[in-house]
Amino acid sequence: MNDVAARYPWPATGRYVRAMMVMGLDGATVGPDGGSRSLSGPADLAALLAIRSHSDAVVIGAETLRVERYKPFRAKPELQESRAAQGLDIAPRLVIVSASLKLPWEEPVFTESALAPLVATVAGHDAARLDRAREHAEVLVAPGSRVDPAWLLDELYARRLHRIVCEGGRGLLGAFADAGVIDEWDVTVSGMAGATRFDLAESRDQDGFLFTRFTRRHDG
């Protein structure tokens, strides 16, 4: 386990749900590029990959899939010994929550991932749409008009997927929070507000609050 992964340990056994996100100083979860990449950086990406590398499943919303253009979840040779020792499959499984089932099925994330993605949707779709989805993913149909996080987690646990990372978007993270199913929040605060960069001047933890000061960067 590398130094970054050691900062984000998983319990040795049992079920555990992490919520992971990056946000700007103004509360934005998307940057000037319309996605999270312009808020992120090498250190944040290293944390994201370290958490994923020891997870069973990564849960995202359909819009996050479309905007962020997720790459295939492949089996990485350098991680196989570590994953096997922890009882994990060859790669994390991607789980997509989509009420509409209107997904980019031609994307490599569906055609080239080591394990077929799971897609959680709602009842009421016609047979043709469900059949198309099932050509590319394992489809879970929730009862009712929404995908309840507790129901989804039970479905994942039944498939022996116990280490869960929810990467958003914002609405899905909110649904998980409202359902009270999150065990840990891993939040990166970017020094961006809009297109303006700020630098951390001070931080302190007191009485359960994290107090920070960021000052505007003046280049040159």
Show where each model-derived region lies.
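Enzymes that bind and transform nitrogen-containing heteroaromatic metabolites
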Residues: M1-G220
